[in-house]
């Protein structure tokens, strides 16, 4: 959801009803020139909730408000809201999971050394922690390696294989990477090292010749949950391994590993990686949240809640996506993701808290770097014409490679156009990170660019909404032109106006603290968004908090409400039409209802 807000915290309210509108992002404020802002103005539009479905859900015992929200998200039967573990898709349905279990069981029985090759984001870190904890619980001799992304690049490269070989492994296991590592797997094979690829990214035309590949998106895999995250794939491999070890009577004392204890990590990685929350993913997330709220979590997860100032007893998808996840990601962006992994695998609570506090400091540093880069990006967009351009490709020689993905995402949110941000890599290369909009599959677009310009893309990979690319240092302008050409073809004639989807007007009886708490307990995320409502209000009072957040007192149908819009430092008109969320706000030990505005406009 996108909002119109003022972007400079130093601005002050300019009179009772005057206001300036500009696009805002969740953390850092951005300002476009007024003509661009007007062109990019979004539209509030209600989702369609099929009335007979709403009635069916209500009759089956679903709360009327939730029934309306769920129906608008495609839920047809109450059974789809049953998030018990028994509802998970079976491990054998994931192509390669059974073979992976056999490979791992053989390695455990032989006492073979395994080395996990991890990715450097939250999904990769949680997948590595799940693998480390799960494999060790079944007796494996397992270690991990997460090479510096800036020195060794992404995936199982030949250089990483050479580095891992010093640890004398007999089996390399990738988590959240490896599906594009054709050369790396070949290098491991030459050294006599077996390879197990666990990944969820889209494969290229050629698969690596690994001993086993587990990836729901590989050819011949009919696993229904194509959106499972890398940590989810590894969790499924462990489920299959436990079943295999059970068949081999490896748990003769009856003490089977409790893999459910890893679901806090699975939930964290799933939400933070912004994969689509289909029912299978919602089960994983729901189970993880339930364990967090009950205090059953890894010491590192508990420490991350403390470092972020969040209450684990009220854990929500928001906490994982916007509080815990960014702190883990900060390690991979600015330092070494081994710091994040150590936080998740240590059983020492004091050590976990120390690491979490260090991660919090890194995240603060990341925000400062990001703010500077965003200012550079906006300067480059002074002459951007949304009437002519359907994409943006930005580059600055001093940009930090670990933060370009965030900047691309911020600018994409503002322009509602596919965006790449580039930074210097190694050996005369530029590293690019891209973010897309729903109408354009980013990896497919890159594949088309690659086929038309075979010498332009050195490497690329990713998903529909996010992708990475490496190009020669001097070819940025060529890439920008080639990418724009492909985007024009794929989006030509498509209405890409930004829309704020809402769940419509909220009845007065449900504008309550109880309703806010009820909604916070549910599972929300990408593809199953948290509810946003839209209503008209009268603004009775307004003031600035910390010179950057607009605090309002509103009235509607005789009721009064407190509301806030973050990163908004201009005044609201007397009558507004607002898109908002219900929030339980705690202040000085008192909890009350607060409306969190996503966007407002004159009524």
Give short role names for the model-derived ranges.
Residues 2-4, 17-19, 32:
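Aromatic (phenylalanine/tyrosine) cluster motif
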Residues 42, 46-171, 191, 209, ...:
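Hydrophobic helix-and-loop "lid/oligomerization" segment in the mid-to-C-terminal part
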Residues 162-231, 235-252:
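Active-site cavity-forming subdomains of large catalytic enzyme subunits
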């Amino acid at each position: 959801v996108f909002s119109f807000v003022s972007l400079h915290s130093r601005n002050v309210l300019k009179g009772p009803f005057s206001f300036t509108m500009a696009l805002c992002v969740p953390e850092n404020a951005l300002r476009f020139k007024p003509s661009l802002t007007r062109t990019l103005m979004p539209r509030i539009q209600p989702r369609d909730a099929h009335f007979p479905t709403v009635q069916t859900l209500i009759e089956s015992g679903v709360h009327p408000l939730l029934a309306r929200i769920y129906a608008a998200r495609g839920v047809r039967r109450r059974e789809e809201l049953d998030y018990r573990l028994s509802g998970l898709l079976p491990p054998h349905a994931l192509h390669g999971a059974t073979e992976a279990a056999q490979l791992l069981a053989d390695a455990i029985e032989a006492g073979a050394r395994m080395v996990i090759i991890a990715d450097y984001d939250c999904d990769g870190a949680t997948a590595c922690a799940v693998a480390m904890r799960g494999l060790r619980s079944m007796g494996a001799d397992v270690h991990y390696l997460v090479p510096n992304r800036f020195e060794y690049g992404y995936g199982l490269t030949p250089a990483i294989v050479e580095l891992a070989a010093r640890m004398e492994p007999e089996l390399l296991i990738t988590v959240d990477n490896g599906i594009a590592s054709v050369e790396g797997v070949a290098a491991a094979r030459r050294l006599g090292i077996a390879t197990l690829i666990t990944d969820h990214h889209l494969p290229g035309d050629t698969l690596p010749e690994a001993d086993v590949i587990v990836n729901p998106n590989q050819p011949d895999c009919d696993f229904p949950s194509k959106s499972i995250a890398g940590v989810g794939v590894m969790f499924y491999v462990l489920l299959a391994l436990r079943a295999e070890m059970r068949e081999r009577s490896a748990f003769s004392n009856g003490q089977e590993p409790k893999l459910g204890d890893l679901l806090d990590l699975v939930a964290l990685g799933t939400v933070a990686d912004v994969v689509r929350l289909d029912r299978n993913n919602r089960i994983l997330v729901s189970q993880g949240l339930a364990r967090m709220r009950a205090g059953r979590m890894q010491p590192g997860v508990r420490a991350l809640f403390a470092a972020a100032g969040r209450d684990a007893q009220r854990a929500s998808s928001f906490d994982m996506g916007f509080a815990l996840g960014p702190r883990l990601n900060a390690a991979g962006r600015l330092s070494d993701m081994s710091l994040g992994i150590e936080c998740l695998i240590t059983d020492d609570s004091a050590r976990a808290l120390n690491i979490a506090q260090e991660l919090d400091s890194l995240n603060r540093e990341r925000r400062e770097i990001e703010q500077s880069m965003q200012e550079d990006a906006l300067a480059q967009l002074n002459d951007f014409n949304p009437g002519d351009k359907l994409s943006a490709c930005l580059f600055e020689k001093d940009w930090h490679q670990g933060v370009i993905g965030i900047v691309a995402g911020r600018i994409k949110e503002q322009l509602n156009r596919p965006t790449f941000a580039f930074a210097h890599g190694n050996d005369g290369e530029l590293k690019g990170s891209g973010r897309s909009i729903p109408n354009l599959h980013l990896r497919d677009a890159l594949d088309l660019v690659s086929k038309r310009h075979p010498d332009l893309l050195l490497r690329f990979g990713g998903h529909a909404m996010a992708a990475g690319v490496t190009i020669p240092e001097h070819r940025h302008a060529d890439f920008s032109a080639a990418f724009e050409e492909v985007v024009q073809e794929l989006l030509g004639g498509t209405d890409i106006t930004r829309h704020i989807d809402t769940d419509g007007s909220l009845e007065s009886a449900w504008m309550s603290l109880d309703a806010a708490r009820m909604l916070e307990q549910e599972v929300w995320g990408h593809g199953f968004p948290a509810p946003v409502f839209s209503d008209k209000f009268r603004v009775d009072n307004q003031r600035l908090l910390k010179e950057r957040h607009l605090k309002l007192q509103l009235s509607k149908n005789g009721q009064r409400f407190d509301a806030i819009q973050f990163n908004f430092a201009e005044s609201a008109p007397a009558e507004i039409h607002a898109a908002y969320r219900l929030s339980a706000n705690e202040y000085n030990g008192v909890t009350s209802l607060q409306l969190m505005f996503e966007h407002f406009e004159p009524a």
